[in-house]
């Protein structure tokens, strides 16, 4: 008697036999039999009952092959010549195969897929000639494929770039249209030297924001000093900058829960300047007022959704209700603006609401998810560990107390939502609980998938975040760490589209990225230059004669812009618009 295992990824009607267990039961004649399997994260126990005999098969304690990270491509760009293009991209993991996909720019439909084979982690490139392009203009994307992630796999370590003394927030730029796609932002609320876990190279952290590349590199060369702007952060653990959210255009919003610095701040992802979005506000004991109107209070968490003019900023406000226990959710239809000078578009608490300061909010396309720290046995309909607010019903329509699916502590209210895969990560009982959900008539049905203790987090997690591929990031003040795990998947593939401005043309126009510089004046110059282009300018870069980038202007959005070269030494420089051809300019 044996148990036969089938792969039903493609449905029971297309089940594939993947193997049989060894036979440990034999009887004379046929006997009644049954089997059952119990899955625990990446392990499985299989029980076989035949006649009056039973046998258990298990994978626990057995060495299993290492799982890769969930893979994706980032840093997509190209170099153009008269004959064609060199396509550049980076991979966060070794790929078993990579495809260059050419898309119709109008419909998004794939026109051609070009196999690039297996490629290593890191920088890669391929070439394509104009003659091989099947249409006059094409968008393109990179599909990366790697081996399955068979279990919840830690892919971080204890090196200095994972160490932070008092981290409270982690946010990732997940918009391929952003100039900063893939960047990871960690907020650190207090200064000190990391000691948790006894690291061999202990990192000393300052108060502010740390920025990592998608490959966990110090992409901005900031070293151990956080970006803090000109804000006098309190330096008190958990106050500010507390948590972060990244808009689709790369803007980084930060919140502060202290009395003196209450509110929401904007960090420029190019210059790392930080300023309050509430220009001209007066602070009265943690309440911000502009023109006699309440605009914001002490904020424990922020989230963001939408893009462009439809961008909405969500904030958990511990001041607005007048009661520190019952917190309001403020909604600001901020769009493309960097400031806000009036009352929130919405400010209220739902029937299930946030009561604890240790909380999170994740807006999705149909509403928002929120979570908070609740002690063991304290999960209730009014103050649940987690709830979902529906835009359709204008109230909370799900909470973890009805039915009660969490009996343990949800310290410290860390939450991440992968809307594409309908997955939730919630801090539970010193680790993570992962749930799947399905929407029916606007109401989610939530099912626990697995739980995993995370000992290195020191007993609780302060914030979770999924990256573009679905890897899970976590920060813990107690554990003094950023940690990263690959989420289990049987389809470890991801398509990253290039920016829409990076159009491939089968006819050489001499205009790279569909933008050429029409005029730079005055040239030569003693200071300010004005650049005019035929189409919309997204970025302007200035290089010195050695090829080093000395100035950059991003998110221009017009056909004309000005830059001040007064601080540059006299000499020859090169101006590039949208990574196009360089034009010489002389600085006197």
Segments (PLM) and residue ranges:
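Repeated scaffold domains used in trafficking and secretory/extracellular systems
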Residues: 29-38, 164-173, 232-245, 284-305, ...
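Blade-level signature of beta-propeller repeat domains, shared across WD40, Kelch, NHL, RCC1
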Residues: 33-66, 458-508
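Residue-level detector of functionally pivotal "anchor" positions at catalytic/ligand-binding pockets or at interdomain
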Residues: 60-78, 485, 489-521, 527, ...
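C-terminal outer-membrane/trafficking sorting elements
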Residues: 97-119, 133-144, 510-588
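Short glycine/acidic-enriched loop and turn motifs that connect beta-strands
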Residues: 1, 53-55, 190-195, 258-261, ...
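Beta-propeller fold detector
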Residues: 13-25, 152-159, 208-235, 273-291, ...
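Conserved beta-propeller blade signature
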Residues: 1, 45-48, 177-187, 251-255, ...
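Structural beta-strand segments of beta-rich domains
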Residues: 83-87, 527-529
């Amino acid at each position: 008697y044996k148990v036969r295992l089938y792969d039903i990824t493609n449905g029971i009607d297309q089940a594939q036999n993947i193997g049989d267990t060894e036979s440990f039961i034999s009887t004379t004649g046929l006997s009644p039999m049954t089997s059952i399997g119990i899955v625990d994260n990446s392990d499985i126990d299989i029980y076989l009952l035949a006649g009056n005999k039973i046998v258990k098969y298990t994978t626990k304690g057995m060495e299993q092959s290492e799982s890769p990270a969930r893979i994706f491509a980032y840093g997509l760009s190209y170099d153009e010549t008269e004959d064609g293009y060199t396509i550049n991209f980076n991979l966060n993991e070794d790929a078993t195969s990579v495809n260059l996909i050419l898309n119709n720019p109008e419909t998004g439909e794939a026109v051609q897929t070009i196999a690039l084979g297996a490629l290593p982690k890191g920088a890669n490139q391929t070439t394509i000639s104009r003659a091989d392009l099947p249409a006059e203009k094409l968008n393109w994307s990179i599909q990366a494929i790697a081996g399955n992630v068979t279990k919840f796999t830690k892919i971080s370590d204890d090196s200095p770039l994972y160490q932070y003394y008092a981290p409270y927030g982690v946010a990732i730029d997940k918009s391929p249209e952003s100039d900063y796609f893939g960047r990871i932002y960690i907020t650190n609320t207090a200064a000190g030297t990391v000691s948790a876990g006894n690291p061999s190279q202990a990192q000393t952290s300052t108060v502010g924001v740390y920025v990592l590349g998608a490959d966990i590199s110090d992409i901005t060369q900031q070293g151990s000093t956080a970006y803090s702007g000109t804000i006098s952060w309190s330096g008190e653990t958990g106050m500010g900058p507390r948590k972060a959210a990244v808009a689709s255009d790369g803007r980084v919003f930060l919140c502060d829960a202290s009395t003196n610095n209450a509110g929401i701040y904007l960090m420029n992802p190019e210059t790392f300047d930080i300023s309050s979005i509430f220009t001209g506000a007066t602070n009265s004991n943690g309440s911000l007022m502009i023109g006699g109107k309440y605009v914001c209070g002490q904020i424990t968490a922020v989230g963001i959704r939408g893009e462009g003019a439809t961008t909405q900023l969500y904030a958990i406000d511990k001041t607005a209700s007048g009661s520190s226990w019952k917190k309001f959710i403020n909604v600001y239809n901020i769009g493309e603006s960097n400031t806000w000078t009036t009352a929130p578009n919405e400010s209220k608490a739902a029937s299930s609401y946030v009561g604890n300061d240790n909380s999170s909010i994740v807006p999705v396309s149909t509403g928002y998810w929120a979570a908070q720290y609740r002690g063991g046995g304290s999960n209730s309909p009014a103050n649940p560990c987690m709830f979902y607010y529906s835009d359709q019903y204008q109230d909370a329509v799900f909470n973890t107390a009805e039915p009660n699916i969490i009996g343990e502590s949800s310290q410290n209210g860390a939450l991440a939502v992968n809307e594409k895969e309908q997955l939730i990560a919630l801090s539970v009982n010193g680790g993570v609980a992962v749930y799947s959900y399905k929407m029916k008539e606007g109401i989610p049905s939530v099912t626990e998938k697995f739980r995993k203790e995370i000992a290195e987090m020191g007993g609780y997690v302060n914030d979770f975040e999924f990256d573009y591929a679905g890897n899970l990031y976590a920060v813990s003040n107690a554990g003094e760490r950023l940690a990263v795990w690959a989420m289990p998947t049987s389809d470890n593939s991801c398509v990253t589209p290039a920016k829409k401005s990076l159009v491939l043309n089968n006819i050489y126009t001499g205009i790279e990225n569909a933008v050429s510089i029409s005029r730079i004046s005055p040239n030569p110059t003693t200071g300010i230059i004005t650049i005019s282009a035929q189409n919309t300018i997204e970025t302007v870069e200035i290089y010195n004669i050695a090829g080093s980038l000395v100035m950059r202007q991003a998110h221009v959005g017009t056909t004309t812009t000005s830059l001040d070269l007064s601080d540059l030494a006299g000499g020859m420089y090169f101006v590039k618009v949208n990574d196009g051809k360089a034009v010489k300019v002389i600085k006197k």
